[in-house]
Design a protein with these regions (language model features):
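Catalytic glycan-binding domains that act on GlcNAc-containing polysaccharides
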Residues: 1-133
Length: 133
């Protein structure tokens, strides 16, 4: 993905988010109205100047730019950035951590699992995560 280099977000992380969000379906629409590969909400897409959320390159560009913003906001903490991608940055700020929503907690674990699987393919370490041992 071009956006990987442009926004300095690991390619495998982008792929993991897409897998968790839409299972690689560019026409995906969630029950809450999120659209496209990275499941951008209409207001988020508008704020990111994404005109067509169903256009894969444009959706990925916007989604990765948003993910970079969240990583910066939460000082590179991947867990918090992913939680915010799913539940919204205000929820993460309000709870001062991953919100107690089962959907969000499951989402973070799913993305991290996919990220680990994709990273193993090229033996890439996962920056911004904490040891769970």
């Amino acid at each position: 993905f071009k956006a990987s280099e442009k926004y300095n977000v690991n390619y495998h992380l982008i792929k993991a988010v897409i897998k968790a969000e839409s299972n690689f379906n560019p026409q995906a629409v969630s029950r809450t109205g999120a659209r496209g590969l990275m499941q951008l909400m209409p207001k988020t897409a508008y704020a990111l100047q994404v005109k067509d959320s169903f256009e894969p390159e444009e959706n990925i560009e916007g989604g990765v730019r948003y993910l970079r913003y969240l990583l910066n906001l939460f000082d590179g903490d991947l867990y918090l950035a992913l939680a915010a991608y799913n539940a919204g940055e205000n929820a993460v700020i309000h709870y001062r951590g991953i919100p107690p929503y089962s959907e969000t907690r499951t989402y973070v674990q799913r993305v991290l699992r996919f990220y680990q699987e994709y990273s193993k393919e090229t033996k890439t370490s996962i920056p911004g995560t904490h040891s769970t041992n």
